[in-house]
Amino acid sequence: MGKKGGKKRQHRESALLGALATQDESRLQVRRTPKLYIGGAFPRSESGRTDVLSLARGGSANIARASRKDLREAVKVARAAAPGWASRNASLRGQIMYRVAELMEGRAAQFRDDLVAHGYGKSDAADEVAASIDRLVWFAGWPDKLPAVLGGTNPVASSHFVFTIPEPTGVVAIVAPESSPLLGLVTRLAGVLAGGNVAILLASEGAPLPSVTLAETLAVSDVPAGVVNILTGRRAELMPHLSRHADIDGIDLWGCPDELLIDAERGAAEHVARIARRPHGEKDRASAFTGERGERIDGMTAFLEMKSVWHPIGS
C-alpha cells in the first residue's frame, strides 16, 4: 500500500505541475506601464501621449511623454514640499536617503534588468547597480556634516559674532546624464537632496527605465511626496520651458545635450537661476561618475547658499 500510495502521490504532483506549466504558458504577462512621478503619485501625461521605445533585447516600452503642463505641475508640488524638506533635521535627511539605498538593494534585480534592456551586458549592469547604491550611501552620510565643513565663524573688526551656514537653494531641476542612466542619475540627484533641496528630474531620453524604477522605489520610501519628481519625455520639447520657469531656483545641466545647452543657459539667466554644468569642452561621459570622480562635494555645494548671521557682542 505504501508503494502504491507513493506512486499515486507522485502522479498527482506531476499532473499538478503540468497543469501549472500549461497555465503559465497560456496566461498573458502583465506588462509594465511606465508613468510620470509627480507629488508621490504616478499620473499619465495630461496630454495622453507616449513614446514607443525599442529595447535592446527585443520588445518595446511605452514611455509617458511629459508636457509643459506636467512640468508646471511638478514645479508646483516641488515648491510646496521645499520648506518641509529643508527644515528637516539634517541627520534625518541622511537616514531617509540611506533608506532609499536599502530599498534599491532589494530591487537590484529590477534595476539590472532595466539596464540590460537598454543594451548593458549583465555584468556591467550589475556593477552599475552596485555602484549606484554605494554612491547613495556615500551621499547619505553628508547632510549633517555640511554645516561643519562649509560653515564657520568669521573674524570681523566690529563687536559681532559672525556665523556662516549653508542653506539649500530650493527647487532644483536636474537633466539626467544620458551616458550613465543610473549611476549618473543617482549621483546628480543625491547631491541635490543631501543639501536640502527638492528636485524635478528630467529622465534620460534614450534609457528612461532606471528612472522609472527609481520612482517606484521612492514611492515606498520615507522621502516625502513632492521632494523628488521624475518626468520622462523629449528634452528638446521640455528644456525651453524648464530653463525659463521662474519658480525653479537652480538647474543641473550636466546631461543637457550640446545643441540645447546654450539656450538653456540663456533661459536660466533670464530669471537668475543657479546652474551647474559639466566643464566646458567635456562631453557627457559615464567615466565622470565612476570611483572617486563621482564622490565630490561640489555635487552638493553647487546648490547651496551661504548665509551669514551677525550677532552683536554685549558689553
Feature-to-residue mapping (PLM):
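Short, structured beta/alpha segment
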Residues: 3-117, 310
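C-terminal segments
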Residues: 3-21, 25-26, 134-149, 163, ...
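Conserved small-residue-rich beta-alpha loop and adjacent elements
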Residues: 56, 141-224
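Residue-level signal for inorganic ion chemistry
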Residues: 57, 93, 196, 228, ...
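Long amphipathic alpha-helix in the N-terminal Rossmann-like dinucleotide-binding domain
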Residues: 72-76, 84, 94-109, 119-149, ...
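Short acidic active-site motifs
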Residues: 124, 160, 237-238, 260
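Hydrophobic/aromatic ligand-binding patch that stacks against planar heteroaromatic rings
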Residues: 190-193, 241, 267
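A charged, well-structured terminal subsegment
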Residues: 232-254
